[in-house]
Amino acid sequence: MFKYYHIEFWEFDDAHLCPPIPGRVDYIHHVNTLLKSSKIIDQIHVLDIGTGASCIYPILGQAEYQWNFVGTDIDKKSLECAQKIINKNNLSDAITLRHQQDSSQILKGILKEDDRFSVAICNPPFYKSEAEAIAATSRKLKGLNKDSKEVVRNFSGTQNELWYKGGEKAFIHNYLYESALFKTRCIWFTTLVSKKDLVKGMYASLKKLGATDIKTISMEQGHKISRIVAWTFQ
């Protein structure tokens, strides 16, 4: 962060998710390609859903492309950490934060009448519960031929960063529905999707909601394979 993106301050509590930078910046680059393909090249305004304490996507998007961001989160402490990072790096003119007061909502209560975003980005919670997160760690350890009597998560992250009632599927489908309610306030909506099996259902839902274009963008980092699904109503 300090060497390649010229960030002077990037600190947050160890309890919060520490994002791997290559995957995050890869998302930013793919979004840039998407915007250019739609001839959206000037005055880019990005909505970052679930900014988190690290404020990682706004920082990278500003460093790489000088985009302007609005970051949202349901956790006030995460927003306080993110705001400190913004202030210490003199980015308050480019990045602003909004608190989502209702954890069941994603865009509702956040978007304003005069908002006009070029794109929305989102890295949704993967798991339904902490138990599911621990089970994922257990499977990982077995794959590495490691045995542990007491299995704990092998990654950091607070509850709102890692799990959501109904898991990734429920979060994403809530996001799809709400995006249709605010179709004039954002040109492209996007999200990371970790489970490939969810994509078919997303396409079906988006077509019913009236999306005019839907794209799947493949992402690969080492052995990790993921994807971005992007859609627009315009």
Residue ranges of model-derived segments:
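Glycine-rich phosphate/diphosphate-binding loop of Rossmann-like nucleotide-binding domains
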Residues: 66-74
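Conserved class I S-adenosyl-L-methionine
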Residues: 41-52, 70
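Short proline/glycine-enriched turn/loop segments at secondary-structure junctions
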Residues: 216-222
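Conserved SAM-binding loop of SAM-dependent methyltransferases across substrates and taxa
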Residues: 53-67
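Conserved SAM-binding loop
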Residues: 82-83
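Helix-rich interaction surfaces within compact, conserved domain-sized segments
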Residues: 223-233
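S-adenosylmethionine
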Residues: 74-76, 88-216
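Class I SAM-dependent transferase core
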Residues: 1-40
